[in-house]
Design a protein with these regions (language model features):
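Active-site-flanking beta-strand signature of metal-NTP-handling nucleotidyl enzymes
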Residues: 2-8, 66
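Short, surface-exposed ligand-recognition loops at beta-strand->loop->(often short) alpha-helix junctions
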Residues: 10-18
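Short, low-order "capping/linker" segments at domain edges
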Residues: 50-57, 110-118
Length: 118
């Protein structure tokens, strides 16, 4: 099992639009062979304060949204990226200025899990 994570720095003025794009997606990936699940994680702008010993809000921090997809194999994910459905899912380009910088794409293999049999 692998997890593909796309870490995306979204400009603060576009956060609602970015979230709406995922809420309104057509779920093409969900029907792809080997697809397990998809999650979108919203950044929580907090940091640990050594002065107070607790977590405090940090609105100045550039957070990253994380779009995670779980796949049975790397080959299943690669096949998705080469499919017409992938091209269709990514055809509606976001407006200029939506992103505060480049995204970071990472692929990890699940080593251990408390809820999956790996």
């Amino acid at each position: 099992m692998i997890v593909v994570t796309n870490r995306i720095p979204v400009s603060k003025s576009y956060e609602i639009d970015f979230e709406d794009r995922f809420k309104k997606r057509v779920h093409l990936v969900d029907r792809s062979p080997g697809f397990v699940r998809n999650e979108v994680h919203r950044p929580k702008p907090v940091k640990f304060s050594h002065e107070t010993g607790g977590w405090v809000e940090d609105p100045e921090t550039q957070g990253y949204y994380e779009v995670k997809t779980w796949w049975r194999t790397l080959e299943d994910f690669v096949a998705w990226t080469k499919s017409p459905a992938f091209a269709e899912a990514h055809a509606n380009r976001p407006p200029a200025g939506m992103f505060a910088g480049p995204n970071v794409l990472e692929v990890h293999e699940i080593l251990t899990s408390t809820d999956l049999d790996v």
